[in-house]
């Protein structure tokens, strides 16, 4: 009976692993030019990945960025008067919390009411901002507008 095979005894077969040719280490191992040919940029060192062969580089072809980004810009969530009529058909007082409960807006973000559509129910709406047409339509329907 032979001994069981052990992991630390395993070796690759003879000739299975061939050593990598180390170029440029004497004439026998591609000495002198080391497989790079003679002279020129590629023989002497590497060309950067971004080099386009003398063509105007991409970063210089593209226009410069102009202007700036206003980090203090307030982005409002939008609700139209037609949405208000659908969500509150019986009329009454409508605050931002009611709009959140109705699923029209998310909490913790300012709300602007816009005048798209028609409204016929009396609503007393409280929000951060209103467009001119939204104010006009809500007040024409007998409601009121309060900016919070």
Curated annotation (Swiss-Prot):
Bilayer-crossing regions = none
- Give me any GO biological process, just one: translation
List every stretch annotated Disordered.
1-45
Q: Which UniProt keywords apply?
A: Ribonucleoprotein, Ribosomal protein, RNA-binding, rRNA-binding
What Gene Ontology molecular-function terms does this entry list? rRNA binding; structural constituent of ribosome
Give me the stretches of Basic and acidic residues compositional bias. 1-12
Does the record bear Acetylation in its keywords?
Answer: no
Q: Name one Pfam family in it.
A: Ribosomal_L27A
Assigned protein family: Belongs to the universal ribosomal protein uL15 family.
What is the recorded function of this protein according to its Swiss-Prot or TrEMBL entry?
A: Binds to the 23S rRNA.
Q: How does it assemble?
A: Part of the 50S ribosomal subunit.
This chain belongs to which protein, by name? Large ribosomal subunit protein uL15
